[in-house]
Curated annotation (Swiss-Prot):
Component of the type III secretion system 1 (SPI-1 T3SS), also called injectisome, which is used to inject bacterial effector proteins into eukaryotic host cells. SipB/SctE1 and SipC/SctB1 are inserted into the host membrane where they form a pore and allow the translocation of effector proteins into the cytosol of target cells. Plays a role in promoting human PERP translocation to the host apical epithelial cell surface via promotion of exocytic translocation. The lineage of its organism: Bacteria, Pseudomonadati, Pseudomonadota, Gammaproteobacteria, Enterobacterales. Belongs to the SctB/SipC family. InterPro entries: BipC/SctB. It is found in: Secreted; Host membrane. This is SPI-1 type 3 secretion system translocon protein SctB. It comes from Salmonella typhimurium (strain SL1344). The keyword Transmembrane applies. One of its GO terms (cellular component) is phagocytic vesicle. Pfam families: IpaC_SipC.
Length: 409
């Protein structure tokens, strides 16, 4: 900052001092002419005021007369209030303008602080073009590298999907085979059981009902022979067939009469009977005996028909069960095939997904390889461009060295 002192000649002060900035190590000085011009005082006005810094040779006698005159003038000026006010106003104005100029210079210097020396203009335009191309290729190289990495991840995911699909395919095929075998075995077992039961029923009918029918049929034939023998005529032959006895017995809860011991014996022999004495066959049977035999014959024939119907119905039911069991066993293969086909269908779907995943894997792998190849080509091109830039810089440096040598020469 500038300090104004009253009683000091402004012209002498401005001519003998310069405005400096004490805070800067290498400050820029401001001349008095610049300060006076900034406040509107030109050189001509300074000359008119008698404040010009230009010195001239003093007139003779000045060295002895002037000091007293100047001293008197200064003493009078100090006492003059108007003069002091004018000088103070002039000093304040000069100080303000000087501070403004100094601050402007300081701001300009501070704005230039931190700037580096720009050598961009010294390089060749071809180098700048190659540098831009190098930056572009580097960007492309990075993009290719990222794309290759992502495609590798896609390929890996597709491989994992394929592996999972293969596992699911195997599980579906296995479950289908197990379901088919289990269902077929179960249905075959049911059919075999029904067929076996039908065979057992038919066997039981033949064992029980057929035996009863045979026994009743034999009894019926015996009774018919006795009844039919009443109309026969004896021709005098010896040892004529005869029915010696007729036994009566109970069967079950119903009281029935049974004809036993119908034998062919000679006339000389006799037999003992339990209930009725029967004469020789060549003799007539009493009507009472004929009625009993006829009634028994009807009962036996009724039992034969009943047993025959029972056996036929049992055999029909048994055959029906056998046919049902055989049909179930034959259809077990078809039903089991349907169950197995469902598993094969699921396995086929998984196989189609495997094919899609494999295609995705191949496409991603191929694209990843192409991206890596493009990245390698970009790297090679960048290296070639760097070599070209180095060659250009070396040529430029050689040319500048030659020019500098010529200038020194």
């Amino acid at each position: 900052m500038l300090i104004s002192n009253v009683g000091i000649n402004p012209a002498a002060y401005l001519n003998n001092h310069s405005v400096e900035n004490s805070s800067q190590t290498a400050s820029q000085s401001v001349s008095a002419k610049d300060i006076l011009n900034s406040i509107g005082i030109s050189s001509s006005k300074v000359s008119d005021l008698g404040l010009s810094p230009t010195l001239s040779a003093p007139a003779p006698g000045v060295l002895t007369q002037t000091p007293g005159t100047i001293t008197s003038f200064l003493k009078a000026s100090i006492q003059n209030t108007d003069m002091n006010q004018d000088l103070n106003a002039l000093a304040n104005n000069v100080t303000t303008k000087a501070n403004e100029v100094v601050q402007t210079q300081l701001r300009e210097q501070q704005a230039e602080v931190g700037k580096f020396f720009d050598i961009s203009g010294m390089s060749s335009s071809a180098v700048a073009l190659l540098a831009a191309a190098n930056t572009l290729m580097l960007t492309l190289n990075q993009a290719d590298s990222k794309l290759s990495g992502k495609l590798s991840l896609v390929s890996f995911d597709a491989a994992k999907t394929t592996a999972s699909s293969m596992m699911r395919e195997g599980m579906n095929a296995l479950s289908g085979s197990i379901s088919q075998s289990a269902l077929q075995l179960g249905i075959t077992g049911v059919g075999a059981k029904l067929e076996y039961k039908g065979l057992q029923n038919e066997r039981g009918a033949l064992k029980h009902n057929a035996a009863k029918i045979d026994k009743l049929t034999t009894e019926s034939h015996s009774i018919k022979n006795v009844l039919n023998g009443q109309n026969s005529v004896k021709l005098g032959a010896e040892g004529v067939d005869s029915l010696k006895s007729l036994n009566m017995k109970k069967t079950g809860t119903d009281a029935t009469k049974n004809l036993n011991d119908a034998t062919l014996k000679s006339n000389a022999g006799t037999s003992a009977t339990e209930s009725l004495g029967i004469k020789d066959s060549n003799k007539q049977i009493s009507p009472e005996h004929q009625a009993i035999l006829s009634k028994r014959l009807e009962s036996v024939e009724s039992d034969i028909r009943l047993e025959q119907n029972t056996m036929d119905m049992t055999r029909i039911d048994a055959r029906k069960m056998q046919m049902t069991g055989d049909l179930i066993m034959k259809n077990s293969v078809t039903v089991g095939g349907i169950a197995g086909a469902s598993g094969q269908y699921a396995a086929t779907q998984e196989r189609s997904e495997q094919q899609i995943s494999q295609v995705n894997n191949r496409v991603a792998s191929t694209a990843s390889d192409e991206a890596r190849e493009s990245s390698r080509k970009s790297t090679s091109l960048i290296q070639e461009m760097l070599k070209t830039m180095e060659s250009i810089n070396q040529s430029k440096a050689s040319a500048l060295a030659a020019i500098a040598g010529n200038i020194r020469a």
